Amino acid sequence: MSPSLEAARSAVAQQVKFDILTATQEADNEKSRQEIARSFISDTITVPTKEMYTYATLASLGDDVYSEPSTTALEAHVAKITGKEAALFVPSGTMSNQLALRTHLKQPPYSVLCDHRAHIHKYEAGGTAFHSGATSILVTPSNGHHLTLADIQEEIVLDDNIHLVKADLIRGSAPTEVVALENTLNGTIIPQEEIIAISDWVHSKGKKMHLDGARIWHVAIETGTPLKDLCDPFDSVSLCFSKGLGAPIGSCLVGTKEFIKKARGFRKLFGGGMRQTGLLAASAAYALTYNFPKLIDVHALARKLEGGLKEIGIRILSPAETCMIFFDPSTIGVDYVELVERADALPSPIKIGGSRLVLHIQTSPQAVEDLLALIRQLAEEKRAAGFVPTDITGTPSGNIYVRAKKPE
């Protein structure tokens, strides 16, 4: 090799070289963990523990496209506990949901019926329309909590009634092929008997049922219901490892062997075929074993926070059935922006995004106490300034998920 070529290669290697770790990385990571313990923005912010990292490094190192052993084992386990024939590991819950819809839907025109608050409608970048060419039928629960069979029967478009008559108006829509539910949705649990009633009727019409079960783990541990029973009414289910369970990445889609075989092809088409996923699969396995049981403590802490908010006079828009609380501080004269700013200004800041408070397996009980103390202080300040607390009752209507935003 000529000296000039060797020098050129060395120069290229120097250009490519990069060390992502800083001199203070360990301290920075610890600071980040402390901040996460005081954040109520989402349960997606949880981070892997050192124990999870250690466990993950022992996983097999194969290529998932060629049936990597650890990933294959995880898929088999998730299929077993959900009572389905097969499972597919994918990078995200969004991909899992969209793969399910794309696999179920054959020939347009067709529609997907879901709750108007559903993740597949609001937070998946229009994927239902883009990937599957499907329109969405958005339904508002008549009870303000969850979709019922009556809600679905009123809005579903069957093959023989594309000109749906409602409120003396005729509107055309594509026939519904999939009814998609979400459990939990905004932290609330759909009664299983309602799900079964919906499933029986939908299947009697020859349609499919999909469940966005990103947080189905919360339902299982809170109600003591086996995952198999929760998933049985559905043709496909998406389950997430990186939200409440605290794994760094990944979801599983479950269904029949034929369904998953087809979904695997779409996963490749979507760019979701991965290589050495053993580390990720092992992290998910660790989360199932060690983090899943912790969810019941998360729920208890959420109920404690809800109780404290009520005592102060805060209106609860949606109670802590699992890990989320939606609240309205206007009853004590405070708006979301003021609360966010005051929480952020604490010596040990607390992070809030708006009306939604999400607790997770790394939430500090002290953070709950500090948040309640701050809100109690704000209530006292408002009363001292002459504000008369209000008592708003009744079921809230409209969107209860309000993000704090300063007026422009």
Enumerate the language-model features and the residues they cover.
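Conserved PLP-enzyme active-site core in the AAT-like
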Residues: 2-363, 367, 371-408
